[in-house]
Structure formats: C-alpha cells, structure tokens
Amino acid sequence: MNAAVIDSHSAQDYVVADIALAGWGRKELNIAETEMPGLVQIRDEYKAQQPLKGARIAGSLHMTIQTGVLIETLKALGADVRWASCNIFSTQDHAAAAIVEAGTPVFAFKGESLDEYWEFSHRIFEWPNGEFANMILDDGGDATLLLILGSKAEKDRSVIARPTNEEEVALFKSIERHLEIDGSWYSKRLAHIKGVTEETTTGVHRLYQMEKDGRLPFPAFNVNDSVTKSKFDNLYGCRESLVDGIKRATDVMIAGKIAVVAGYGDVGKGCAQSLRGLGATVWVTEIDPICALQAAMEGYRVVTMEYAADKADIFVTATGNYHVINHDHMKAMRHNAIVCNIGHFDSEIDVASTRQYQWENIKPQVDHIIFPDGKRVILLAEGRLVNLGCATGHPSFVMSNSFTNQTLAQIELFTRGGEYANKVYVLPKHLDEKVARLHLARIGAQLSELSDDQAAYIGVSKAGPFKPDHYRY
C-alpha cells in the first residue's frame, strides 16, 4: 500500500490504511465492550490506582477490534502504548484507525509486505522524546525476538547473514538497515525492558527455549497457559472462527466433506468440533499418542497425512510445527482441495515449494495453486492464520478471557517485576479463577458456594483456589 509506505516516513506517528475508517471502528469497539466484561471490570477495579502509570508498552498482537478494547484498557490503567500487528493479514483497518484517532500510535494495515511488517515491529520501540519501551506485550514472540536477535547482531553480524526463508530475508535486512543507522539500536532498547507477557503457544515455546539455554534477558509471563486462555481462546475461539474463515473465503458446503485436522491440542480440538458440527467427516493426524487416543475416543478417525492427502477435501493445520503439509502432500491432493492453517506461523504448510507453479488470485487471501497437470489447490491466507486472514478472528467474549489475563500479567510484571528472575512464569491460580468469575454473570451462570464443612472436607478455602496447580481441566 503506497500511502502506508509514505506515511511510515512522514511526521505522522502512525501507519494505517485509512484514518477515515475511525468512526466505523469506534462503533464496533463500543459493541465489543459489551461482550468483554473482564476487561471492563478490570478497568473499573484498577483505574483509580493507575497501576500501569509509567509503563511504556510495545505491543505486537493482531490489531483487531478486540485488541482495541485491550489497548484502551491498558491506557485507562495508566500505560502509554505503541502497537503493531503480529501478522501481515490480521489487522482490521477500521480498528486500527479508531485506536489512532483516540491517540495511540498504531503501525498496521491488512495486507502488509514482510518488509513493512518488520519496519512496523521496529516502530513500536521508537518512543518519542528519547524515551524507551519498558514492557513488551507479544503474540508469537516476534517483538521479543527482534530485540534479542538485533542485540546479538550488534556483536556478530553472522547471525543475520544466512536467511533460510523469505521471512528471515525481510527480518535480517531490516536489522541490518537499523544497525547501519545506529550500531547499538537494539541493546539500548533491550536494556530498558522489564519483562514480556506472551499470548500464544508458539511464542511461549520460544521463551521456554531461551530460558533453557540461559538466554532469556528478562522475566516473562506465559499468558497462553492460563486455563482461562488456553482452554477457552484456543478451544472455543477456534471452534467458531475457523469455519468462519473457511466459509467467508470459499462459500463451500462443509457438510458431507472429509476434513483433516493436523494436531489435536486445544486448537485442534476446537477445529475438529466445529467441522463435525457442520456435518463434515473429520480425520485427525497426530504424533502424540495421548492426543491421538483422545481424538479416537471422541470418534474421530486418526490417520496419517500421507493416507489422507488424496482422499480429503479440507485440510487444516493446527500444530505449531514445520511443514506438516509438504509439497508431496499437496501434489497428491484432489482437485480444489482447500488447504489452510490456524497455527501462528505460516511454516506449517510448505507454501514456498509451490511458488514454482502458477498462482491465480481469486480474491484477497484466496489463491489457486495450479499444478502442471491442471489440478488446482485452494490455499487460504497464503498459509497464515485463516481465521484472521479470511475472517475477523475469535469472538469478543472469549478474547475478553485472554486479554484480561494479559492485563493482569502486565500489572504483575510492571509493579513487581523486580521480584522475578529471568524465567517464564504462569499467573497464579487465584487470578485464573478471578478471570473466570468476571465472565460468569454475562452469560447468566450462577456459581455455587461451599459450606464451611464442605470446604474443610476437601481442604480448600471457600474463596478458592479450588484446584491444585497440576490439575488438568
């Protein structure tokens, strides 16, 4: 988008598709707030205390309407915020415009190039008046990776010398460009970061790997593994948003089709439920025997991708892994098979291997890959998140669960960060239960209460927590 590229070098401290969309975005933000009781009640509870006063949060998370409510909650609690999307296709342009109009710098529009994506990821760390971000709110770990990898490159350029994919080409080029301007750009910013709160499975995996290797430079909160995130956002959110994305993109009738879900974690479970609910015959591929047994006990047929490739109609990857659907799988697929991904990164499908063939764009984020024999495979969102690339992501209510956890984690880390070592932490059980409590009334749920004798009998407080940390919900 030429206008956005021009704006990124102008005096305006934001980059959005069209600021005129702000009015529409504000109307949708107002509607979303009615479905996000956790965030609204957290605002009411903490606003007078201003626990985030002095926090300068660099946010990298899908710039949707629901994220707009999160941003305005963080600001209501005292934070200054700069924001970019964590995916090139996930921004809702009217949401970005509304947040900018309200005074928050946003650098995001739907359909960014990879070069623009990494430029915008830098912009969230470029604070005015010589200040620096002191907190990161991340989804997928790209903002965290940027500072850490850039700091390493200051000392050893070889770490950005050999890109292995087009994403790394853009990232490494962006780091090189910033180092040419300021050789300590990254380390100066890294030194001010008190900690990060991470939203999703993929980013959490990166953090645990850094902790294991002794390379984690600040404390981190794993928001993803809060029960009220992973068992709600990942499961119930995907249960609604996956089929929304597929149907908006293709208008296909799901009933009667064979659908393959690769991965049967929380995300895969939600995907399988939704596809079966619309009448598909659902097959599951798994590498974990426990998850495979769960799928089989739920009535799904557990197969390999090699077996399913030439038989199924719809393929969904939900593993967080690499090349789960490869070139040979796609070559074997039926004419007009639909292929999509709902994991965070685009590496689950080997999209790069299909660039050798003719591509025909049908509409934004919907492409035909035309094989030499004339067969066509329908690829959605270029292998990136289908629910955000081809639809609008999860519903507001379930995102209120996730974002209430994010807000509480930001408060905890900003106000008590000095008490934490450079390790990965999960929010305590009483806060997980608090997040759930904040959402019960909105859906008419009435909570029973233990008597004194009952509480004593099972050895818990009447106010909770009710389960040990190792309990599996």
From Swiss-Prot:
Alphabetically ordered keywords of this record: Cytoplasm, Hydrolase, NAD, One-carbon metabolism
Functional pathway: Amino-acid biosynthesis; L-homocysteine biosynthesis; L-homocysteine from S-adenosyl-L-homocysteine: step 1/1
GO CC annotations, alphabetized: cytosol
Positions with a binding annotation for substrate: 64, 139, 199, 229, 233
UniProt cross-references to SMART domains, sorted A to Z: AdoHcyase, AdoHcyase_NAD
Reactions that this protein is recorded to catalyse: S-adenosyl-L-homocysteine + H2O = L-homocysteine + adenosine
GO molecular function terms attached to this record: adenosylhomocysteinase activity
Superkingdom, taxonomy of origin: Bacteria
Cofactor comment text: Binds 1 NAD(+) per subunit.
Membrane-spanning parts: none
EC numbers, comma separated: 3.13.2.1
PROSITE patterns: ADOHCYASE_1 (PS00738), ADOHCYASE_2 (PS00739)
Compartments, as annotated in UniProt: Cytoplasm
Function: May play a key role in the regulation of the intracellular concentration of adenosylhomocysteine.
NCBIfam families, per database record: ahcY, PRK05476.2-3
Sequence similarity: Belongs to the adenosylhomocysteinase family.
PANTHER family: ADENOSYLHOMOCYSTEINASE (PTHR23420:SF0)
Name this polypeptide is given: Adenosylhomocysteinase
Organism: Burkholderia pseudomallei (strain 1710b)
